[in-house]
Each structure stands twice: as C-alpha cells, then as structure tokens.
C-alpha cells in the first residue's frame, strides 16, 4: 500500500450511477449502503462472495462476484478500494472510458458535503470512539448517519444514511486518505508511529495530521494525554479553530477522573468545562475506553447536547465488533476478540483484561489468567515493532503466536513471528504458525477463570468461535 493522492469529493447528487470495485470490505460496503439509502443506483464487485455483498444486493445493488470489464456497465462514477491493483479489468475499463474514478475516501467525503460531519482520526481508538459518538447521539434522539470501520454490536451494521444533518465517520490516516474529508468537527484520539510502510517517520505522520486539521471548519476535539495529539491541538489553535481537550490531565476541558473497575464494567467521572460533573458507567473494560467515552461526550456537547444526558447513552454502549468483543464462554473460560495490531493497542487491551480479572479476584473470585492468541499483521510492522510487540505481550500469562498475516505485503527474508516470540520476557510462549495447532495449544493451556483474547487485524478473528467450541 502507498499514500493515496488526495481527490476532492463530488456531491452525491452529481455522482450518477456508481460502481464499486472491491465492494465487500467494511469501508466500501458501508459507503455503498449509504448511497443506496440515499437513492443512488449502485453496482459493485468483489473477488469473493460475502454476507455484506448479499445485504447490499437486498438493498438494491447489482452485485458481481469476481472482476470483469463488463461489470462496470453504464456507471458514471467508479469507486476503487485501496486493495485493487492497477491491472484490475474493471479499473482498466473505467480508465479506458474516461469515467470519474474516486478512491474510497473521496466517496466517503461526498457523504459529508452539506452535513454536520464529525470525523474521528487517530492511531488508536477510532472505531470505538466513532461507535460511541453514534450511540450517544442516537440516545439523545438524533438520527445521525454513520460510517464506521467495524459493526455496532447492537445492530450488526457499520453504516447508515441517517435522517438528520449529522454524520459521523471514521477517518483513515493509514494511507493519507483522510485528506479527502472536510468535517465540521474532528476528533484526534492520539498520534503515534504506525503505517511506516507508507510514512518515512513520525514527523511525516504529524505533517499529514496537520494537513487534515486544515480541512476542519469549526472544532477539533483532542486527547490531551497523548503528546502527538497535543501537537495537533497547537496546529489547530494556530489556524484559529476551536480546540477542546479531553483526558486525565488536570488541564483537560473534559477531565476524566475517579476511574474504578468492577469486572468488565468501568465507572468514572467527567468534569465538563461548564456545569456539574457527570458520572458514567461504561460496560467495557479499560482506561483507554474512558478516554474514548470522554471524546464522545465532548462531541455531543459541542453539537449542543447536555453532557449529563449524553453519558446515559454510554451506559447502553454494547461495543463494536472486534473491539474486545465477547465471543463465548465454555468450561469457565471467557473468549474475546480484539482488533489490536499495534503494541500500544495490545498493551491497552491486556491492561484492561488484567484490571477486570483483578477486580473479580478482589471480590473473592478465582484469580484468572490472560491467554493470548496473537497474529502479527504485516511483515513490515513485525520487523519494525518486534521489540515493542514482545514487551506488550509480556503482560499476558500465556502467549500463543501465529504466523504473520501478510495482507498486502510480500514476505521479507528473515522476518517471521519468531522475531517476537524470542523476545518475550517469560517462557510461557508458543510459536504455532499452523491455525489448528494454535487453537489446540490455546485450549491445552486455558483454565477455568481465564480470559482468552484472540488479537490481530487478520483472520485470527475466525478462531475465537473455534476455541469456544473446542473448550466445550
């Protein structure tokens, strides 16, 4: 993957008939869904059939499995996934016919035009924060549109056109494509080194976030505990934007304090800039999720809603798919799935799991352990962050590591998941590149009271249900 050349979005009513190449992914299917709901004629293709494709077909899309030039049909606009190669026959056909070709983010940007757009950006926490904002606004009586990188657990949907002026979207910095969005409000959760296959270094990432801030028209909501996000806040102030901060720091406009944990429920207080403190009960573990929640309250307040009512919506938040998602329980072992694929994300989820187990033990429960099944994502990320991955995974009691999920990359000589396993600071580590062997290993070490976490951005997510079944 490489950085995407920014393309200015086109108003939805000027797109004409739209064809999606690579329509089966979460991001592309979400945009297609919203366009269908807004009355746009949509067709699309993907290499493999999927439930998402069938859902779009039921909404009225013309769906093709496999790629062929004739699938483009009489489209006026073609939207292309970043996973599509230049040699794709549909893309070749679209270019030969001089059709309007948009990257995914430009199509997403079209959905924001003329609406109160809220875009959530940052290295970590985007999907959960976008989901929280959506659920909070729904609780407050709004009917926002939304396009999220994961599905809401309560509805099973990751996108909807909505019925009022607000739309909440997840802004992807990985390839620079968030520079095609022009939101009224932006959230910056944090800024760290990641996607270094695209960016030369952290400074280049900061430059891209600074450019993104230049596309925001009104307000920037920033996680003030993070040094990288604080730098972005300074850029926003210099450009005359309204800046609101959230975090545990005393200087935060929406200050999080008095965090307590009861199993997988987290209680805390938020001090807003005006008015009384608001008390929140969040049915999710993790200090990082209290910060995501504070961002959601700040956005709701910015739009004009009462923070005290907003936190009631957080109490109803059931989470987003693959974000510490409960997959099942068998023989006293609880299995969860996590999209964490960066060392910071892994450490945050393992800290959350440990806090939940400790709170249960403090009430006289069994002192359970953490068993992780981790799948490294990308050869480049494994090579760059091997030490950091090992340090984060040391927080688990038992660590089973799969082979690297290559995704878009070709193998690199000498780069395997063993770069991580050989650096983990205890001996309860098992390298199992074979999926069946990995599941068997997890089941053999798990004990009643333990938490099993499948972690990674690849197909490790498929193994959670298998582990539950095998444990039973």
UniProtKB/Swiss-Prot annotation:
One of its GO terms (molecular function) is ATP binding. Signal peptide: none annotated. One of its GO terms (biological process) is peptidoglycan biosynthetic process. It is found in: Cytoplasm. One of its GO terms (cellular component) is cytoplasm. It catalyses: UDP-N-acetyl-alpha-D-muramate + L-alanine + ATP = UDP-N-acetyl-alpha-D-muramoyl-L-alanine + ADP + phosphate + H(+). Pathway: Cell wall biogenesis; peptidoglycan biosynthesis. ATP binds at residues 122-128. The keyword Transferase does not apply. Its main location: cytoplasm. Its EC number is 6.3.2.8. Belongs to the MurCDEF family. Cell wall formation. PANTHER family: UDP-N-ACETYLMURAMATE--L-ALANINE LIGASE, UDP-N-ACETYLMURAMATE--L-ALANINE LIGASE-RELATED. This is UDP-N-acetylmuramate--L-alanine ligase. It comes from Thermobifida fusca (strain YX).
